[in-house]
Amino acid sequence: MGRSINLEGKVALITGASSGLGKRFAQVLSQAGAKVVLASRRTERLKELRAEIEASGGAAHVVSLDVTDYQSIRSAVAHAETEAGTIDILVNNSGVSTTQKLSEVTPADFEYVFDTNTRGAFFVAQEVAKRMMMRGNGGQKPPYRIINIASVAGLRVLPQIGLYSMSKAAVVHMTKAMAQEWGKHGINVNAICPGYIDTEINHHHWSTDHGQRLVAMLPRHRVGRPEDLDGLLLLLAADESQFINGSIISADDGFGLS
């Protein structure tokens, strides 16, 4: 008999939820029954997504979050729990990139990428985890889930995005360190490493000459869709993933083998 993931009664915080993968993650978790908290700097787009989710029968809340600002992180997490209840699931998705050679990277470029992808991801996870641990110490039984969104670029260096690769490699090892330290508190921390995914942000690129050459180099000559990550996301968010902790899971259609 088949089983479906049921997240009813869970509260999920999704960062970078205003577009791309973050938007899809929020929709999928809501469809599975979770109450979702949508976090981003672009709150107008979050309000549009909230309306879509509510029109489909889901529950959603909007919080303003700048992951490069520590006080914004603390305020957003506190606001999320005031509005929606205690957080059971964090999808740590905010991310940015630049395209350039490492010899051309400026201090401003470095700070731009690492402040969001690494520092921001760390302090969002830390703030949520501290609250999870506090509840655990108070007798509120876990499980809790933190899902960091890394990248295949964090597992292998890709041309022209070396800085991004470095920041996501840090997220990979950050995930393992968090899993090792926080697992005893009932917090499972895992990372998804997406391959090349067609989103609204990069959609135009796949029709360019460079995009077509890249697709031709992929093992099955195709890029993924946001929905290709649905099953993995739901598994890692669910109670059924209780024995998965500290795992770095590629969802790249075999790109890492090429």
What are these regions (language model features)?
Residues 2-4, 156, 234, 245-258:
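Short C-terminal tail/terminal secondary-structure segment
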Residues 11, 18-19:
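Conserved glycine-rich cofactor-binding loop
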Residues 43, 64-76, 107, 228:
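The beta1-alpha1 cofactor-binding region of Rossmann-like NAD(H)/NADP(H)-dependent oxidoreductases
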Residues 101-102, 109-114, 202, 214:
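Substrate-binding pocket helix/loop in short-chain dehydrogenase/reductase
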Residues 125, 167, 175:
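Active-site helix of classical SDR
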Residues 151:
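Residue(s) in the substrate-gating loop at a strand-loop-helix junction
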Residues 183, 188, 244-246:
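Short, small/polar-rich loop/turn modules that mediate ligand/substrate recognition or access, typified
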